Amino acid sequence: MDSIETHAKQLGQQTPLPASPEAAQLDRVPNPHADTDYLARFTAPEFTSLCPVTGQPDFATLVIDYVPDRWLVESKSLKLYLGAFRNHGAFHEDCTVGIGRRLVALLEPRWLRIGGYWYPRGGIPIDVFWQTGEPLKSVWLPDQGVAPYRGRG
């Protein structure tokens, strides 16, 4: 099996926030349990990007669930990649689906889903959901745990 050091290039050193999501380096590490179906979850409760029209900040909670195959995403590189959206202008749907697709291209997981729970803009919350196909029946798939947005009342 490949060593972690050859794949986790940013781990253990000071790494600046990438200038853009495209410039961000996502790292992967070998999955020591590639023979086992299990779910890994990442939750980013303070995700930010910019509206591509107004430049105003948009805020979301992202929940990424995946069933790994040979590769795991290295969490520091994922944190830096998601942080690179802070000054990136894109619509909610583009951010959410684009993140999911980039992870699928990197990891080639057995299954992946992403939920983007966006705070209201113009009084309308936008939730975006994307997945690669049917979830595996052998894996416990908990609810993403993000309550529907409720205004006052």
UniProtKB/Swiss-Prot annotation:
Positions annotated as active site in the UniProt record: C51, D58
GO biological process: queuosine biosynthetic process; tRNA modification
UniProt keyword annotations, A-Z: Cytoplasm, NADP, Oxidoreductase, Queuosine biosynthesis
Native organism: Methylorubrum extorquens (strain PA1) (Methylobacterium extorquens)
Family: Belongs to the GTP cyclohydrolase I family. QueF type 1 subfamily.
UniProt main location, coarse: cytoplasm
Functional pathway: tRNA modification; tRNA-queuosine biosynthesis
GO molecular function, one term: preQ1 synthase activity
InterPro entries: GTP-CH-I_C/QueF, NADPH_dep_7-cyano-7-deazaG_red, QueF, QueF_type1
A Pfam family this chain is assigned to: QueF
Alphabetical list of Gene3D superfamilies matching this protein: 3.30.1130.10
UniProt subcellular location: Cytoplasm
Catalytic activity: 7-aminomethyl-7-carbaguanine + 2 NADP(+) = 7-cyano-7-deazaguanine + 2 NADPH + 3 H(+)
Region spans: Disordered: 1-30
GO cellular component: cytoplasm
Entry protein name: NADPH-dependent 7-cyano-7-deazaguanine reductase
Residues that bind substrate: V73, E74, S75, H92, E93
Gene: queF
Known role: Catalyzes the NADPH-dependent reduction of 7-cyano-7-deazaguanine (preQ0) to 7-aminomethyl-7-deazaguanine (preQ1).
Keyword Transferase: no
Higher taxonomy: Bacteria, Pseudomonadati, Pseudomonadota, Alphaproteobacteria, Hyphomicrobiales
EC number of the protein: 1.7.1.13
